[in-house]
Every structure is written in C-alpha cells, then in structure tokens.
C-alpha cells in the first residue's frame, strides 16, 4: 500500500482511501448517461448520495459481477444461435424429432466444452501475459527509474498535451507510489489492465460452459417435450415452431441485456440479436432443405 494510506485496487485513488469504482454506482452512471440526466449522474458518482436518495444501502460490487454478466450474455448468445441454427438445418433436412435431438444434444455438449475450455485457455494466457508484463515493469522501475519516468513524461506531453513542466511534476508525484505508477504505466504504455478483482480462468470457463449449455438447450426444449408426448418418431414441425418462438424471445431478452451491459440502445441491440438468430436459422433451414432435395433426388434416381 502507498505510504499515505490511500488504497488502489484498479480504480482512481480518492482521498479517503476508496477507489472510484467503489464510490460510485457504475450501472446507475451508465443509465444516467443514456438519459443524459446530469443530476442522476452526479448522484451515481456519489454512492452515499445515491443511497440517501434511493434508500438502497447495499454494497456495490461491480468488477467481478460485470465479468460474470459478460460471460453469461455472450456465452448464452453463442449457445442459442448455434444450436438454433443446427436445429433449423436438421428440420430443413426433414429429420425426425429423435434425430434432431441426437444431433442437437451432441453438438450442444461438444460446443459447450469447446467454448468453456477456449474461455479458460484465453483467460489463463491473458492473465499470465499481464502478470509477466507487470513483473517486467516492476523490474524496470526498480533498476531503470529515470528511463521509466522519461517514458511517462513523453506519454503525457505527446498523448495528452501536457506541458513538459506539468508532465514532469505529475511523474515525480506518482512515482512516489510505486504500485500505482506500475499499474498506470501498464495502462498508458501497454494498454493492459491490472489489479482488478477478476474471476479466475477456471471460473470464467465454467460460467461460459454453463451459459452455453443452458441457453443452447432452449431450442431443444420443444423437441424434448414433443418426443415425451408423442414418441421418438414424432414429426418435428410443431416442435420446431415452438423452438423458433422460444429462441427468438430469448435472443431478444439477451440482446436487450447485452445492450444494457455495453451501453448501447437496448431495444436496438435486442432487435439485432433476434434478427441475427432469425437469419442464421433461415439460412440453415434453407441449406438443409436444399440438401434433402438433392440427396432425395439422387436416391430416387438410383
């Protein structure tokens, strides 16, 4: 910790030791920005004021939860679009409900494992790389302090338009707090974030796997119910209609959530995601139907 007692955990330092990310409500700040509501923005930047105005006395923990929300939303979108397209292609090829289920469930499990493992590998590699760069920067700050300070002076003057005197003063002050200086340098020089309370690679992989499985299972739910009611040889048309309704509705909800999460227009994001799923399903159905016609014609000719 810095000698002054001011804390740093990935946000901007404030006088009482909290970080900026902990003394404001980021979700409320984003909502206020969407509405261009100045008073709501001011309230969101003061957690105490926000609680006084709303009566909400719960602690605000945004860093880790945001990572989980991201994994759930994007993993869910991948899962439902992928499996819905597979289901549509199978129905277009005139497969029975049981055949659609076999193909769909097999792909669901395989794709979920692939997505979860890919997220784990990607997160682990990113974490290792950032840690290695942090250790290098710490070594350089310890052994080549003047060179590191000069780099930051150049960044302030060239990137942000500081005068050389102000840049030098800024560097001299921040260099007293080595942990802050290293983290700040990693952001400005390397574009790397370090010091946030992020989920472990294993947790990120498991969340991605679970989200893909859960949302990917929704297009198959109608087929599971249809087979349970009418047997393995049941026609797939009505089950596919149910899958279409469930999938498009879920895509709309996930798209809306994605828009809220990334600060886009939620309704526009919802419509785009629903359109994406609809287009993927339509193309897959068309290809399946075409292949069924070609294969059927060849079998008849034979």
From Swiss-Prot:
Regions that span the bilayer: 71-91, 100-120, 212-232, 236-256, 277-297
GO molecular function: manganese ion transmembrane transporter activity; metal ion binding
InterPro entries found in the cross-reference section: Ccc1_fam
GO cellular component, one term: vacuolar membrane
Gene knockout outcome: Mild growth defects in cultured parasites under normal conditions and more prominent defects in replication in an iron-depleted environment. Lower number of parasites per parasitophorous vacuole. Accumulation of less iron and/or altered distribution of iron within parasite cells. Parasites are more susceptible to iron and cadmium overload. Parasites have lower cellular iron levels and increased catalase activity. Iron overload leads to reactive oxygen species (ROS) accumulation. Decreased survival of parasites within macrophages and decreased virulence in a mouse model.
Vacuolar side: 92-99, 233-235, 298-302
Residues noted as binding Fe cation 2 in the record, renumbered to the chain: 137, 148, 151, 185
Subcellular location: Vacuole membrane
Protein name, UniProt field: Vacuolar iron transporter
Species for this entry: Toxoplasma gondii (strain ATCC 50861 / VEG)
The gene coding this protein: VIT
């Amino acid at each position: 910790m810095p000698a002054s007692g001011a804390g740093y955990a990935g946000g901007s330092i404030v006088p009482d030791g909290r970080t900026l990310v902990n003394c404001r409500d980021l979700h409320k700040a984003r909502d206020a920005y969407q509405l261009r509501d100045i008073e709501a923005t001011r309230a969101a930047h003061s957690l105490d004021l926000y609680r006084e105005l709303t009566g909400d006395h719960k602690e605000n923990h945004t860093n880790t939860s945001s990572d989980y929300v991201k994994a759930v939303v994007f993993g869910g979108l991948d899962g439902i679009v992928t499996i819905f397209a597979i289901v549509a292609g199978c129905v277009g090829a005139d497969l029975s409900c049981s055949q659609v289920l076999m193909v769909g469930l097999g792909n669901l499990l395989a794709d979920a494992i692939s997505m979860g493992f890919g997220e784990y590998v990607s997160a682990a590699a990113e974490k290792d790389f950032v840690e290695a760069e942090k250790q290098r920067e710490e070594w350089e700050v310890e052994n080549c302090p003047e060179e590191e300070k000069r780099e930051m002076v150049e960044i302030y003057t060239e990137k942000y338009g500081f005068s050389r005197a102000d840049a030098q003063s800024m560097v001299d002050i921040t260099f007293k707090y080595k942990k802050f200086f290293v983290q700040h340098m990693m952001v400005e020089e390397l574009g790397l974030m370090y010091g946030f309370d992020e989920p472990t690679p294993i947790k990120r992989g498991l969340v991605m796997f679970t989200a893909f499985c859960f949302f990917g299972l929704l297009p198959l739910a109608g087929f599971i119910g249809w087979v349970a009611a009418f047997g393995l040889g049941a026609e797939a048309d009505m089950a596919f209609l149910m899958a279409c309704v469930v999938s498009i509705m879920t895509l709309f909800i996930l798209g809306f959530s994605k828009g809220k999460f990334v600060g886009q227009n939620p309704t526009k994001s919802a419509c785009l995601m629903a359109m994406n799923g609809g287009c993927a399903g339509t193309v897959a159905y068309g290809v399946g139907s075409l292949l069924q016609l070609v294969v059927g014609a060849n079998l008849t000719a034979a």
